[in-house]
């Protein structure tokens, strides 16, 4: 079935975001059950949930990959992007937030707003995603709806609108009161799967609380919406339609967040949640036109726009790549404008290459339905793309556009991985290639000295999951090293006239090459990734023939790969070749390469070499009472506090801390703050290691 522009008002692209145990997967499962996609309820406890379809996730009970699932509620199509709730996977959360129009934030009725939910909420703020809240697990001992609403206001700085009240609490939780229509919905014990619920008048015991709740709601909506404010000032009661329309406007503009409640596990409250998704969250038509730039316009000075219409030229964003055992590589696309048909040729505007669209599928968690055409505003998976990776744009060849590219942070933690057998070596190659396609925050390098494969990622859990996927999906048996920090070396002073002569005489042609070099430090740009290497040739009068100069350069570069202190790459160096000598018969490229390499090593060891380490920008969000502890701990990790600020009722500490001091930080921070603080960490720059620490690292590297 192809959606047409007329249907766009009836499409919702939503994500379900939550803290790790708030019941996100269960809530998604129930949505799929009530919309008729699933006929047996999948429980995360049993490891059978439809959305968590990678074996990894079923074992851990956490959701890692955002599978996109399509379902229908009444006459509305809902595309659900399942987002991971763990901090190491924030890259996936960010990626899915880009392609959503709205989100449902699920909270645990007992725990309320947990640290991870704060982090995901801030990311959603960054992308201006309108959302509604579902306070789940209302049947749990200690569940408190009002406390959750207060926490959403205080901790997240949001403006919550309680549109429901719970009937009963904990094990007596029976249903909800609709504060807009002033009715009660009660789930009868006779329908254990919750398909049936009765709409009744509000029970007397709740009449007063419901009336107060309704008045509070109208008052809060009036503050966020001029139309209701006028009625309110005139003393008129808004109709249900007026109230719903005003809440929708306030939700889409970000002025307010409707809050609902229920228990997904006990099958209560999910149908009203579906009604709220349709009523309050935006359709693709409510979202502003997406912006991008012309691929030729390198400075991105001119902004191009694409409106969500089939009349506009095609623009689609690849937001997820997955491998399917039967179909091969699946690329998930969000179509922002135009139409996509199977067999069509489109342009990948980032790489400037053409791609042919194979089959197009609408995905239902782990089942799929083939379609031939898809229009603006929809989310689908396509087969047959050769060159497209995550974050790239596919567009009409005649109207190229690059939708803002997603920036991926550089990985900060690495482990060596060693295949056990020859056949594991081959499997490892395939696994690494596939995983790197799916996840741009995962990088692979080879350590030239040890020949080991080194994989790097965003955190300890991130790497653990990747390694487990290699074992499970690709059957790679491998030994895994300990996580390591990527150090660098540089020099601090200039040395001049360092001479080295390489000569070897063993009957017949020998080897001969003499070089004289200067070595001086270059300013290192902070990312430490810059090779920071320059080579200047000052040879005159043919003292070294021109054809041997590149060999001297190559020798110096090779030597720079393994520094003189602890064998880490040397950066920020300028080599000047000043003088030399050659022999008509015995000189060769190899002789000059060796001479260059040896002269470089000698010069570097005289040039006051120092060790550099990656320093991370760490941002800790903590309740005020733990502030002193958090700062003291960061100082003990050689951290430099940069700033402290208040944000939505919590304190934010920003500091620069060496990565080597951050291992195991997540556990320490949790225990210091009872799990209430959270942190983010991104690479900041390379900085010199203090000499006492440097001596330890060097001794360790030399095996002393």
From Swiss-Prot:
InterPro entries: EF-G-like_DII, EFG_II, EFG_III, EFG_III/V, EFG_IV, EFG_V, EFG_V-like, G_TR_CS. It is found in: Cytoplasm. Residues 9-285 form the tr-type G domain. GTP binds at residues 18-25, 82-86, 136-139. GO terms for biological process: ribosome disassembly. Keywords: Cytoplasm, Elongation factor, GTP-binding, Nucleotide-binding, Protein biosynthesis. The keyword Cytoplasm applies. SUPFAM superfamilies: EF-G C-terminal domain-like, P-loop containing nucleoside triphosphate hydrolases, Ribosomal protein S5 domain 2-like, Translation proteins. Pfam families: EF-G_D2 (PF22042), EFG_C (PF00679), EFG_III (PF14492), EFG_IV (PF03764), GTP_EFTU (PF00009). GO terms for molecular function: GTP binding; GTPase activity; translation elongation factor activity. Belongs to the TRAFAC class translation factor GTPase superfamily. Classic translation factor GTPase family. EF-G/EF-2 subfamily. NCBIfam families: EF-G (TIGR00484), PRK12740.1-3 (NF009379), PRK12740.1-5 (NF009381), small_GTP (TIGR00231). This is Elongation factor G. It comes from Thermobifida fusca (strain YX).
């Amino acid at each position: 079935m192809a959606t047409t522009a007329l249907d766009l008002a009836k499409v919702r692209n939503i994500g379900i975001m939550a803290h790790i145990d708030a019941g996100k997967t269960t809530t998604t499962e129930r949505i799929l059950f009530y919309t008729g996609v699933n006929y047996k309820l999948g429980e995360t406890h049993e490891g059978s949930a439809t959305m968590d379809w990678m074996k990894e996730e079923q074992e851990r009970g956490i959701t890692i990959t955002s599978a996109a699932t399509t379902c229908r509620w009444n006459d509305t199509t809902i595309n659900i992007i399942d987002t991971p709730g763990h901090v190491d996977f924030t890259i996936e959360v960010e990626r899915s937030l880009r392609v959503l129009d709205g989100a449902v934030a699920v909270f645990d009725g007992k725990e309320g707003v947990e640290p991870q939910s704060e982090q995901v909420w801030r990311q959603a703020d960054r992308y201006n995603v309108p959302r509604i809240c579902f306070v789940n697990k209302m049947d749990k001992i200690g569940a408190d709806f009002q406390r959750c609403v207060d926490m959403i206001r205080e901790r997240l700085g949001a403006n919550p609108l309680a549109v429901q009240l719970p009937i009963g609490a904990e094990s007596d939780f029976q249903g909800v009161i609709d504060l807009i229509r002033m009715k009660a919905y009660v789930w009868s014990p006779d329908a254990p799967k919750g398909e049936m619920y009765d709409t009744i008048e509000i029970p007397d015991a709740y009449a007063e609380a419901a009336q107060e709740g309704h008045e509070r709601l109208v008052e809060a909506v009036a503050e966020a919406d001029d139309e209701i404010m006028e009625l309110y000032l005139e003393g008129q009661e808004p109709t249900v339609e007026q109230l719903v329309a005003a809440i929708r406007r306030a939700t889409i503009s970000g002025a307010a967040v409707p809050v609902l409640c229920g228990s997904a596990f006990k099958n209560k409250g999910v149908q009203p949640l579906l009604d709220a998704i349709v009523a309050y969250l935006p359709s693709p038509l409510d979202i502003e036109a997406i912006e991008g730039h012309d691929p030729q316009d390198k400075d991105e000075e001119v902004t191009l726009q694409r409106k969500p219409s089939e009349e506009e030229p095609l623009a689609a964003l690849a937001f997820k790549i997955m491998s399917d055992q039967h179909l091969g590589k699946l690329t998930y696309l969000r179509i922002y404008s135009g139409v996509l048909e199977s067999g069509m040729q489109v342009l990948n505007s980032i790489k400037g290459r053409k791609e042919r669209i194979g089959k197009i599928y609408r995905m239902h968690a782990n089942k799929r339905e083939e379609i031939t055409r898809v229009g603006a505003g929809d989310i689908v998976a396509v087969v047959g793309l050769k060159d497209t990776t995550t974050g790239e744009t596919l567009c009409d060849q005649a109207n190229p556009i690059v939708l803002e590219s997603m920036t991926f942070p550089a990985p900060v933690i690495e482990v060596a991985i060693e295949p056990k057998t020859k056949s594991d070596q081959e499997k490892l190659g395939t696994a690494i290639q596939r995983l790197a396609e799916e996840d741009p925050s995962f990088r692979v390098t080879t350590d030239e000295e040890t020949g080991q494969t080194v994989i790097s990622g965003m955190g300890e859990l991130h790497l653990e999951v990747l390694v487990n996927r290699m074992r499970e999906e690709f059957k790679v048996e491998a030994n895994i090293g300990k996580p390591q920090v990527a150090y660098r070396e540089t020099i601090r002073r200039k040395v001049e006239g360092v001479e080295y002569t390489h000569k070897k005489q063993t009957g017949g042609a020998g080897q001969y090459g003499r070089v004289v070099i200067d070595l001086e430090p270059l300013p290192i740009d902070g990312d430490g990734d810059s090779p920071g290497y320059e080579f200047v040739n000052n040879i005159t009068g043919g003292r070294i023939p021109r054809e041997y100069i590149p060999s001297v350069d190559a020798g110096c570069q090779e030597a720079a790969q393994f520094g003189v202190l602890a064998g880490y790459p040397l950066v920020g160096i300028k080599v000047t070749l000043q003088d030399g000598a050659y022999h008509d018969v015995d000189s060769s490229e190899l002789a000059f390469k060796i001479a260059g390499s040896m002269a470089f090593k000698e010069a570097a060891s005289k040039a006051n070499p120092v060790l550099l380490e990656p320093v991370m920008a760490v941002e800790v969000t903590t309740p005020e009472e733990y502030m002193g502890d958090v700062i003291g701990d960061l100082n003990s990790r050689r951290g430099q506090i940069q700033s402290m600020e208040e944000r939505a009722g919590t304190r934010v500490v920003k500091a620069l801390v060496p990565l080597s001091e951050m291992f195991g930080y997540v556990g320490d921070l949790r225990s210091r703050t009872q799990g209430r603080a959270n942190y983010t960490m991104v690479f900041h720059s390379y900085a010199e290691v203090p000499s006492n620490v440097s001596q330890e690292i060097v001794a360790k590297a030399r095996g002393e």
